[in-house]
Amino acid sequence: MLPSWTPGGHIDVQLPSGRRRQYSLCGPPGRRIDYRIAVRRIADGGGGSIEMHDAFDVGDSLVFEGPRNAFYLGAGERDVRFVIGGIGVTPILPMLHAAQQRAINWRAVYAGSSREYMPLLDEVVSVAPDRVTVWADDEHGRFATADDLLVDAGPATAVYVCGPTPMLESVRIARDEYANAPLHYERFSPPPVVDGVPFELELARSRRVLTVPANRSALDAMLDDDPTTAYSCRQG
């Protein structure tokens, strides 16, 4: 049996190159016979997703650590809104099953450019079709606004959001007026550097010094210098 896990949890996969990447568990909650993860291949990303797709085949073994969970479904929350964007569906799908099993009053909005590019869409809808709203930009002729994503979410509604940074930030700003309402989110990419200042970074082993511009991170500068630099989640 694999280690137990809870909805929102993830594992840290060690790739053959030495890279480490975090992937949310998106199978049935608590399943321990096997784990399911979803990996979107990103051509212009950091290389981890391409390596996952190219290095492994059916029957291969993965080396991983975990599971861990910093994005879990609160035990005492009874009125919940889930906001989903793109591959952000992976940690939230098991939460939907758990919320349904706990008889929580929940609703979900799944937004994306088109239904074709919304991973696991059928599985999300099948949890409870009357509780899930699908927003496809190509059907509406525009992106979903925070008002669209949070319709009927009241001042006491707990909100869980996982998706692209613009979606996450719009929801976060919209919920600022409800300071006491729980807001839970998980980022799959780092937030942009805002109001930064340039600085110099000394690499301890090589004693080399890199200049980091005001609008970039230390890791960005290291990757510019050596694209094979190993890193993990980029969340700091």
Predicted regions, residues:
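Short histidine-centered beta-strand/loop micro-motifs
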Residues: 3-4, 52, 73-74, 231-233
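Ferredoxin-reductase
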Residues: 1-65, 112-114
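Hydrophobic residues in beta-strands and at strand termini
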Residues: 15, 25, 39, 73, ...
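Short acidic/polar mixed-charge low-complexity motifs
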Residues: 17-19, 206-208, 227
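FNR/FR-type flavoprotein reductase catalytic core
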Residues: 49-207, 211-214
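Well-ordered beta-strand segments characteristic of repetitive beta-sheet solenoids
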Residues: 37-39, 80-84, 222
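Immediate flanking context of iron-sulfur cluster ligation sites
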Residues: 211, 216-236
